[in-house]
């Protein structure tokens, strides 16, 4: 099951279909209006990257990663990463090297890192929170959020509309 939230969404759609044929969804609002904590954190990192040179951030992150837990450790570790690396760390349980250790055969398809980094590369001049929103709108929102909502509602003959994403 790609996303466990599909189960309650299925039953919610099934129940709604008993009463209505069309529902409105808030899908896309968090991505559009910056509603995820990750976007706020991206703003903190943007400020950090303005004030601290990259080599120093990378060094601080590498050193912090080897130390026992302390307040601010994770900020320093993530602060030593590029925005796309922080994005990957926040969205995937296993990074590519870790995934490969669990698999019997090598991964031959495009890795999530390559796929996501491509979208960051498309918008290099934007601030980090806006980059995160852009990437989410072109990946997570399309291939997870909207896909599962559409499938679960269609499985129950329910039309789902997403007004926040309507261009009109």
Kindly give the residue locations of the regions a language model identified.
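Structural motif
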Residues: 1-3, 123-136
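ATP-dependent adenylate-handling active sites, centered on carboxylate activation for C-N bond formation
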Residues: 1-112, 128, 151-168
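A short, charged helix-loop
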Residues: 109-122
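Short, flexible segments with low predicted structural confidence
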Residues: 112, 124-126, 141-144
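Short Ser/Thr-interspersed hydrophobic loop/turn segments at strand-loop and sheet-helix junctions
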Residues: 137-151
């Amino acid at each position: 099951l790609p996303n466990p939230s599909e189960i309650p969404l299925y039953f919610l759609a099934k129940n709604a279909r008993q009463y209505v044929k069309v529902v409105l969804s808030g899908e896309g609002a968090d991505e559009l209006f910056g509603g995820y904590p990750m976007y706020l954190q991206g703003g903190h990192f943007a400020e950090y990257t303005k004030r601290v040179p990259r080599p120093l951030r990378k060094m601080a992150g590498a050193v912090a990663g080897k130390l026992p837990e302390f307040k601010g450790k994770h900020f320093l570790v993530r602060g030593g990463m590029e925005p796309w690396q922080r994005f990957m760390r926040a969205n995937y349980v296993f990074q590519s090297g870790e995934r490969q250790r669990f698999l019997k055969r090598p991964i031959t398809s495009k890795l999530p890192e390559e796929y996501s980094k491509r979208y960051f590369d498309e918008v290099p001049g934007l601030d980090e929170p806006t980059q995160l929103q852009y990437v989410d709108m072109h990946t997570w929102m399309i291939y997870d959020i909207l896909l599962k909502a559409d499938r679960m509602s269609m499985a129950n003959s329910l039309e789902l509309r997403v007004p926040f994403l309507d261009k009109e």
